[in-house]
Amino acid sequence: MALWGGRFTQAADQRFKQFNDSLRFDYRLAEQDIVGSVAWSKALVTVGVLTADEQRQLEEALNVLLEEVRANPQQILQSDAEDIHSWVEGKLIDKVGQLGKKLHTGRSRNDQVATDLKLWCKETVMELLTANRQLQSALVETAQANQDAVMPGYTHLQRAQPVTFAHWCLAYVEMLARDESRLQDTLKRLDVSPLGCGALAGTAYEIDREQLAGWLGFTSATRNSLDSVSDRDHVLELLSDAAIGMVHLSRFAEDLIFFNSGEAGFVELSDRVTSGSSLMPQKKNPDALELIRGKCGRVQGALTGMMMTLKGLPLAYNKDMQEDKEGLFDALDIWLDCLHMAALVLDGIQVKRPRCQDAAQQGYANATELADYLVAKGVPFREAHHIVGEAVVEAIRQGKPLEALPLADLQKFSRVIGDDVYPILSLQSCLDKRAAKGGVSPQQVAQAIDDAKVRLAL
């Protein structure tokens, strides 16, 4: 059933209908469309369009339809309706007859779809927040279990300074906490209702839009009808949140892919999140992580595509805006799936402590400690930096770590170096000295874990 047609003398070409119709994807807004219609029916009573008995009949029929949709949402796709609004109205008319045709009084699909999408976005944000916090919790638990797992920290993918696996986990907790904050901020701007703005100029009926917004769970109604029906900032904002969040998950995946590789060997992934090769029987591939990394690109593309769609649109509504949903649905589905999958990867991961520690002792990751030692002896840092660089060259020439160089060799580069240098060069000393807030010292890591547990109510 089309919601228009009186103006036209010819039927739409079937090819245009297939091109124009959106039911194949906006069917996902069915529940929100029904909920919005119930609220609108109540508003129509307040302005005398519906009697209380008529509204009751409509609400009862809509609630029955809501249960039918929840039981089998795929039934919607069997229809040739243009969009979800047409489908809901058609089903309502099937149930209550001519009365169903009164429901759309004073309402446009422009404010209707804007309301539906905002309601869907609000619900989806809550799902994303839950999944985000579940992953943060998994990272904190993994950190707590691996506070003593010393491993190399990297810059430029070169061993730089020793850290712990716990400290690495907590770095991603921080990223996810920022993602959580962005979603919460987005939710605040989502929480205004456009229903009652009509096609673009507002409704001709004196409906209390603030009351209507409250019935739908919004904190307030929007202030300008032109903006309200054409606003898709929330779509851009959620896509941006997703793009940033997926960058974080992609980096998480890349790190673990490397840590799991034969070249690093710091962790072993569970069989539950890996797959094999059809040819090479020895392979155990990190497919879950590679797919997280790969799916990141689709989400970035959705954001870019939506920005390009909106950038040249005049006020108010244009059919271009129908393109807001597929990319948004796909991007947020991906983000949600990847949050769940990342948590599953952590469930069963094994950290290979001996291999991690062995790698941390290689690559001259304690060179900065020697420079700090020299500074403590009164050597200016820039000079100390140069001295240590020369010492590292000598250690490389001898094929030894810095702490294995004889004192006589170290003193060739600076006479201030004494026997007290060797304890300073130990891995434990490297960690212990990073005791400022946010550092890798055991005390700071333990405190960060405790703080995260309080914030996450673990």
Swiss-Prot record:
Going by the UniProt record, its keywords in alphabetical order are: Amino-acid biosynthesis, Arginine biosynthesis, Cytoplasm, Lyase
Q: Which GO terms describe its biological process?
A: arginine biosynthetic process via ornithine; L-arginine biosynthetic process
A Gene Ontology molecular function term of the record:
argininosuccinate lyase activity
**Location(s), subcellular:** Cytoplasm
Query: Is Lyase there in the keyword field?
Result: yes
Please tell me one Gene Ontology term that the record gives under cellular component. Answer: cytosol
Where in the sequence is the signal peptide annotated? none
Q: In which pathway does it act?
A: Amino-acid biosynthesis; L-arginine biosynthesis; L-arginine from L-ornithine and carbamoyl phosphate: step 3/3
Enzyme Commission identifier(s): 4.3.2.1
> Which transformation does this protein catalyse, written as a reaction?
2-(N(omega)-L-arginino)succinate = fumarate + L-arginine
Supply the Pfam families for this chain. Answer: ASL_C2, Lyase_1
Please name the Gene3D superfamilies in this protein's record. Fumarase/aspartase (C-terminal domain) (1.10.40.30), Fumarase/aspartase (Central domain) (1.20.200.10), Fumarase/aspartase (N-terminal domain) (1.10.275.10)
Principal location: cytoplasm
Query: InterPro entries under this entry?
Result: Arg_succ_lyase_C, Argininosuccinate_lyase, Fumarase/histidase_N, Fumarate_lyase_CS, Fumarate_lyase_fam, Fumarate_lyase_N, L-Aspartase-like
**Which domain of life, per UniProt?**
Bacteria
Q: Which family does it belong to?
A: Belongs to the lyase 1 family. Argininosuccinate lyase subfamily.
Which PANTHER family does this UniProt record tie to the protein? ARGININOSUCCINATE LYASE
NCBIfam families in alphabetical order = argH, PRK12308.1
* Name listed for the protein in its UniProt record: Argininosuccinate lyase
Q: Which organism is this protein's natural source?
A: Salmonella typhi
Q: Cite the source lineage.
A: Bacteria, Pseudomonadati, Pseudomonadota, Gammaproteobacteria, Enterobacterales
